């Protein structure tokens, strides 16, 4: 699917140009970020991988998202893109509370969960690599404990996260998180689209308002310009 979705078109159509292509599970401003080459848009390669996996004619799946306008816009783009590779995507939009119940708080192993595809976003609110990876891809974070909705399990990656938390050596931590990011990029349990630009508007006479990566607003040092 990484090859079947045009990330440049996604940024232009869905994000109005206000994003950059993802090169890691982490955003570029996150501590210990290590970028990789984005997966290129290559429809023929996508079809070949599908055929090699036993789906020469594609398959049908359901993509779950919330009912927000932005989520639906993203899912409709994904639906159109994957159709060109032979994948039929049915969009199932739900209220956030229902999504939380059926997806994020699902009980039991991944094989028993009624989720085929799910569209979501994540950023490290702490600015640290661990919180950008562990909640969404560590084995210990499978629902209902946290948000590993892809039910990705990789002992080597989990080991990197564990070792990085056990050392205060920043050079060693950087190496471990770099390795974890490489594993994720190669295994690609998730299709990573883009890093949104944080954009906001304020009156010309307001200064020192800050926006955190998770969208939080910091007005602690806000002031009015004379």
Explain the meaning of each model-derived region.
Residues 2-12, 155-165, 170-174:
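Extended ligand-binding regions for polar small-molecule ligands
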Residues 2-85, 151-153, 179, 226:
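Append "and occasionally in soluble cytosolic enzymes with long acidic Gly/Pro-rich linkers
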Residues 4, 136, 183:
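Conserved catalytic core of Hanks-type protein kinase domains
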Residues 12, 53-70, 110-121, 167-202:
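Bilobed periplasmic-binding protein-like "clamshell/Venus-flytrap" ligand-binding domains
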Residues 31-45, 49, 53-55, 105-111, ...:
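Short, solvent-exposed loop/beta-turn-alpha elements that line the ligand-binding surface or hinge
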Residues 70-73, 101-102, 127-130, 202-204:
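Extracytoplasmic/secreted cell-surface and envelope-processing proteins
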Residues 83-138, 176:
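Periplasmic binding protein-like
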């Amino acid at each position: 699917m990484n090859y079947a979705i045009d990330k440049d078109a996604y940024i232009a159509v869905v994000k109005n140009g206000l994003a950059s292509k993802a090169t890691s599970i982490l955003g570029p401003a996150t501590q210990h970020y290590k970028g990789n080459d984005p997966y290129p848009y290559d429809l023929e390669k996508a079809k070949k991988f599908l055929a090699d996996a036993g789906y020469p004619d594609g398959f049908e799946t359901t993509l779950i998202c919330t009912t927000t306008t932005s989520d639906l816009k993203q899912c409709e783009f994904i639906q159109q893109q994957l159709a060109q590779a032979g994948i039929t995507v049915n969009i199932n939009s739900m209220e956030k509370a229902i999504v939380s119940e059926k997806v994020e708080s699902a009980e039991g192993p991944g094989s028993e969960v009624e989720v085929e595809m799910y569209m979501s976003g994540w950023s490290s609110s702490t600015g640290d690599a661990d919180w950008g990876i562990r909640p969404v891809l560590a084995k210990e974070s499978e629902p209902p404990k946290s948000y590993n909705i892809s039910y990705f399990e990789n002992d080597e990656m989990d080991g990197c996260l564990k070792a990085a938390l056990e050392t205060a050596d920043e050079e060693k931590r950087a190496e471990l998180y770099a390795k974890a990011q490489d594993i994720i990029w190669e295994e690609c349990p998730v299709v990573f689209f883009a890093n949104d630009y944080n954009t906001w508007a304020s009156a010309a006479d307001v200064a020192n308002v800050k926006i955190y990566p998770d969208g939080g607003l910091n007005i602690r040092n806000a002031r009015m310009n004379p």
